[in-house]
Amino acid sequence: KLQKSEKLFKTKIQQQQKEALLLEKKIKKIIEEEIRKAREAAKKISESSTISLTPEAKIISDKFSSNKGSLPWPLDQGLIVQFFGKQKHRVFNEVETFNNGINIATNKNSNIRSVFDGKISRIFFIKGEGKAVLINHGEFFTVYSGLKEVFVKLGDKILAKEKIGVVLTDENNNKTELHFEIWKGYDKQDPSLWLFEAY
């Protein structure tokens, strides 16, 4: 009986990893498109191919970068329950998982907020995970997934700490978790190094 439940659990972990890979592919595709758009916009301003950001996007990007370690959390209250990167599973040591961001446990119906000024680039749905919002901060992107409700629209300009939605509670296990990612171009960043006192 124990082996059967262990098998089911491992299958569930594999399914979660598959879903995480699909999310990563989707995010990369969106970021690729955003970078292409930014380059086109920058070329209209200057024919120099070395500039890839508009002046406004460059200012936002530079400010974002200079706030490493002091960005506000995407929730008023929360605890990091899964960190960035490769880690062994808590129960099955032989099972390794990779997290592209961090998972923050919080209270039911908590509001999610932007960690920095930016523009809503995408709002999309992830099967089994709810809605997700991708915000463009110049060269940087933040991803907020696991939302049941979204307050923003595509193209909206948003300020730091402005509410973007409400976190979803998984009715099967009663978990209320936000999955949060930071990307610099195509490179995944460890969000806990960017958020204020995350370590």
Task: Walk through the language-model features, giving the residues of each.
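Alpha-helical oligomerization segments with coiled-coil/rod-like character
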Residues: 1-60
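Short glycine/threonine/proline-enriched tight-turn/helix- or strand-capping micro-motif at secondary-structure
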Residues: 53-68, 81-114, 137-138, 182-184
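Extracytoplasmic
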Residues: 68, 75, 97-101, 115, ...
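Generic structural motif
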Residues: 73-82, 110-120, 161
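Residue-level recognition of beta-strand microenvironments
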Residues: 83, 123-124, 167-170
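Zn2+-dependent peptidoglycan hydrolase active-site motif and core
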Residues: 114-149
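Conserved, short, structured surface segments that act as functional micro-motifs
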Residues: 133-134, 154-199
